[in-house]
Amino acid sequence: MSASMYGAGVEYALHSMLILATQSAPVSVSDLAGYQGIPERFLAKIFTRLKNARLVKGMEGVAGGFVLAKPAENIDVMEVLRAVDPGRSLFTCAEIRQNCALFGETPPGWAVSGPCRIHAFMEEAERKLQTFLASRTLADLVCEYSCKAPKKFARETEGWFLDRKKDRVARRQAGGSGEL
């Protein structure tokens, strides 16, 4: 397995927001984590970042949870990446061009003047990646996902979340904890 540019947090955020985009009611972090088999504490931290970036908003109460803060077609993938994994760069230049064994202690001006060509190349690649990610929305991902999954899967997913919410509300009304 190779190292990735973006961490698991980005994957968790995008999958969770995809779910929020397809649900008719707020969804709790606990339910999102349980549904996807991912760590709840980590997902809660991700949702704090998403909320601070105004991509999701929280709804209070035992039947509460999170909803998208704006329509899925108005949330681009780059916004999610910036919220969850801010400051991540495709490439970090260590300026090794000045360390060539042939240069000794003083590299010639031609070797170190201007920007490093490798760095400039990688910055261009990063700009193109960011432009692509900014051109794709959460709604695009929902559409692609919906085309792949059978129609009944959307109903089953909605039912799974509604059943969890009903169970939580019933436990709260019976005097137990509403949390799962």
Regions found by a protein language model. Give the residues of each.
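Extreme N-terminal segment that seeds HTH/winged-HTH DNA-binding domains in transcriptional regulators
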Residues: 1-37
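Key DNA-contact positions within bacterial/archaeal DNA-binding proteins
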Residues: 41
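Beta-hairpin "wing" of winged helix-turn-helix
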Residues: 54-63, 67-69
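C-terminal regulatory/oligomerization modules of transcriptional regulators
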Residues: 93-180
